[in-house]
Design a protein with these regions (language model features):
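N-terminal charged segments
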Residues: 1-69, 82-84
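Helix-loop element at the rim of GNAT/NAT acetyltransferase active sites that forms part
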Residues: 68, 136-138
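Acyl-donor-binding surface of acyltransferase catalytic domains
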Residues: 51-130
Length: 138
């Protein structure tokens, strides 16, 4: 997962704010301080699951993450290769919500620095800007 552009970034932040553990068949990601954070408490699978995997995945989640009574969800994530499909109708029939997240990445060879005409005007922050910035952040 370390070379997948989306998951590598997620795992960077997951390690910063929580725990990432590599198991034989998947990774566990836990954010103990945020039990209701679906994408901070999940199993990360190397390949898409099938309906046959539902039982052992749920048991693994419950044993490694869901033992905390504050966690009242199960979340599984996995990468999809181009043209690959997930076969998770059994999960959906059991009440799981299926969603796909897309990652757009541009390699160093394709990246072009913006030209002067592409740049938006910018100014440094002043002391007076900070109150407005803090209000915006909340």
């Amino acid at each position: 997962m370390e070379d997948h552009p989306g998951f590598a970034t997620d795992l960077l932040f997951d390690r910063y704010q929580g725990e990432v553990t590599d198991h034989d068949a998947f990774w566990t990601v836990r954010t103990p301080g945020s039990p209701d954070y679906y994408f901070g408490n999940y199993l990360l699978l190397p390949t898409p699951p099938s309906d046959r995997d539902k039982g052992w995945l749920e048991a693994s989640f419950d044993r490694l993450i869901g033992w905390d009574p504050r966690i009242r969800h199960r979340t599984f994530q996995w990468p999809l290769a181009a043209g690959q499909n997930s076969r998770v109708a059994g999960f959906v029939a059991a009440g799981y919500q299926y969603m796909e997240c897309v990652v757009l990445a541009l390699g160093a060879m394709e990246w072009q620095a913006p030209t002067g005409s592409d740049l938006a005007p910018a100014r440094p922050f002043t002391a007076a800007d900070w109150d407005q910035w803090l209000a915006f952040e909340l």
